[in-house]
Amino acid sequence: MGGRGAYSYSSGSRKRSSSAPLNAYAVASLNRGIAKGTSTEAAIGRFREQLMDAKVEYSAYIDDAGYVHALGSTGKEGSTKVAPISAVAKQRDVSTVIHNHPHGGSDGRKWGGPFSEADLAYIASAHGATGGRVNRIVATSNEGTYSARVKRSVSGGQVRSAAKRADAAVSGKKYQSELAMWRAVNSAYASEFGKIGIEITFTEQKKKRSRLVTQKTGTY
C-alpha cells in the first residue's frame, strides 16, 4: 500500500525507521479489553487510537468478531508491509484489512489523507484472491477513518482507470488548506471508484489516543 505522495506537501523523501518491535504484546495491545465484548468497528477504533501519532504505517487484519491479527510494518516512512493472506487463513471470518495513514513525518503532511490507488488496488486484488471474503480496507488518520468496500469483482485495469479519472478531476487546482485538498481528493475517488463497485466512505473524527504496548510492563 502507500503511494499517497501525489498530492502531498513534500519536504523531502528520506525514510525514518521506527524502533518499536512488532510482537505478541503489540497484537495483544490492539485486542485489549475484548473480554467485555468487541466488534469490527471497535477494533478499528482501538487501532486508530493506539497508532494515532505513529510516523510509519502499520497494517493488520480484522475478523468479523472484532479481533486484530497479523500486525505488520516495514518500520520505514512511505511504505507498508501487509502480512500475506495465508497468515490469517486459519482465522474465521477475516474480512477487513486496516492500516494507518501517518502525519507529521518527513513528507510534511499535517493530515493522514485518503486512500491511494495502491490501497484500492490491494483490496480489489485481495477480494478476487479470497473469493470475496476479504472485501474491505480501512485507513485510519488524525482527521478520521476512511473505508472502502468492494461490492463486486474489480480488475486492476478498472482501478487504474478510475484513479486516473479521479486524479484528473483534482490535479492542478488550488486549495485553501491541505485538509481541503484531501477532502477534494477523497470526494473524487469516492465518485469514480463507486462507478466500478468500490464504495468509499469517510467518517470525520476527533483525535483520540491510547498507547500501543510493545513490551511487558508491571501492570500489563
Residue ranges and their predicted role:
Residues 2-30, 80-220:
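Active-site-proximal loop/helix of nucleotide/amide-processing enzymes and allied scaffolds
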Residues 57-64, 137-140:
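Short beta-strand scaffold segments in enzyme catalytic cores
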Residues 27, 56-57:
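ATP-dependent kinase catalytic cores of phosphoinositide-metabolizing enzymes
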Residues 31-49, 113-122:
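Charged, amphipathic alpha-helical segments
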Residues 51-55:
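A short catalytic or substrate-binding loop motif that flags glycine-/basic-rich loops and adjacent residues
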Residues 69-81:
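Structured interaction and signal-relay segments at domain junctions
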